[in-house]
């Protein structure tokens, strides 16, 4: 009997496969295609203290082996989220991870405080989205600001805290150490890489926001490299993401040192990606005669 269970800061997941924030709604949108009970966890779309309208359109465009998005963290706000989305997810046997966004330290803390007594398992703090003009980018790209906001958020949190790191920095390990120093329980990486696309026929930017976050298969080698670097630099468990579309992709991250993985852009071109990866991991373990998936974590030194 193979064991696919992994543990993140004392929270046990039935397997290491989760959704990535912003690509799976809050689960309801995919529940017709995906048996949410099969997933290790569902990471919700980012939620703020008040509703956000998001950026003007166009907000999404395709790139070679990927996409650019500048959604702007459109969300219904924490109050509606708690009334509508958490009760829906509680119907399923999967861990609930709420992604939190904000434009100031106070915004983040307000959301975290409201979630303190809700039946959610982990909180992922989004300090790295590159398409919001205020707030997040400054926290995610400055180690002092990142350490400070981690400390503040921890004061209000009852659940373990995941700090989601931006790849748009000179040294990802410096940011990882800053989050660790601030008291983070878990790190997740990478968020999207900042990119741009020009519409040569309209002679303007493809996105109304000019820049957007690049994701999809094209970013995977960068993400695997950064996950490996971070696992060598800190003692925290890591959730790896960035271009994961198959079990083989997920295994690269796990072997590089990630305890769990998040599947994002793949959900758009293959709604069944997450459960296919769950099955693919089990199949690989059986073929390779690996009894416990934890034996594969960080096997590449």
Mark where each language-model region is:
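Hydrophobic faces of well-ordered beta-strands that scaffold small-molecule active sites
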Residues: 17-20, 40-44, 96-100, 123-125, ...
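Alpha/beta enzyme core
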Residues: 32, 103-239, 245-256
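N-terminal capping/small domains of soluble enzymes
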Residues: 1-96, 102
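Structural signal for hydrophobic packing residues in well-ordered secondary-structure cores
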Residues: 93, 116-119, 157, 281-289
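Short, surface-exposed connector motifs at secondary-structure boundaries
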Residues: 11-14, 91-96, 156-161, 232-236, ...
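Short gly/pro/ser/thr-enriched loop/turn and capping motifs at secondary-structure boundaries
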Residues: 48-53, 130-132, 194-197, 268-270
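C-terminal helical cap(s) of enzyme catalytic domains, especially alpha/beta-barrels
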Residues: 54-64, 198-212, 254, 266-291
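A short, charged, Gly/Pro-tolerant segment at domain boundaries
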Residues: 294-301
């Amino acid at each position: 009997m193979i064991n696919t269970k992994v543990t993140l800061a004392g929270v046990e997941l039935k397997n290491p496969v989760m959704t990535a924030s912003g690509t799976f709604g809050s689960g309801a949108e995919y529940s017709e295609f995906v048996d949410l009970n099969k997933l290790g966890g569902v990471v919700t779309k980012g939620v703020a203290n008040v509703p956000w309208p998001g950026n003007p359109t166009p907000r999404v465009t395709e790139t070679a082996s990927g996409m650019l998005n500048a959604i702007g963290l459109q969300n219904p706000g924490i109050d509606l989220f708690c009334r509508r989305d958490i009760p829906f997810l509680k119907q399923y046997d999967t861990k609930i991870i709420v992604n939190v966004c904000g434009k100031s330290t106070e915004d983040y803390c307000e959301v975290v405080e409201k979630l303190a007594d809700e039946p959610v398992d982990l909180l992922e703090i989004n300090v790295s989205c590159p398409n919001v003009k205020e707030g997040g980018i400054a926290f995610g790209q400055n180690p002092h600001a990142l350490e400070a906001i981690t400390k503040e958020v921890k004061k209000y949190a009852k659940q373990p805290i995941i700090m989601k790191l931006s790849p748009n920095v000179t040294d990802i390990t410096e940011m990882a150490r800053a989050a660790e120093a601030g008291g983070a329980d878990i790190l997740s990486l990478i968020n999207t890489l900042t990119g741009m696309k020009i519409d040569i026929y309209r002679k303007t930017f493809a996105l109304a926001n000019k820049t957007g976050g690049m994701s999809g298969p094209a970013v995977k080698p960068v993400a695997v490299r950064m996950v490996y670097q971070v696992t060598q630099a800190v003692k925290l468990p890591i959730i790896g993401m960035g271009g994961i579309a198959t079990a083989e992709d997920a295994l690269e991250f796990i072997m590089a040192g990630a305890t769990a993985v998040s599947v994002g852009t793949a959900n758009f071109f293959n709604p069944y990606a997450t459960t296919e990866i769950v099955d693919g991991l089990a199949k690989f373990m059986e073929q390779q005669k690996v009894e416990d998936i934890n034996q594969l974590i960080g096997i590449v030194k």
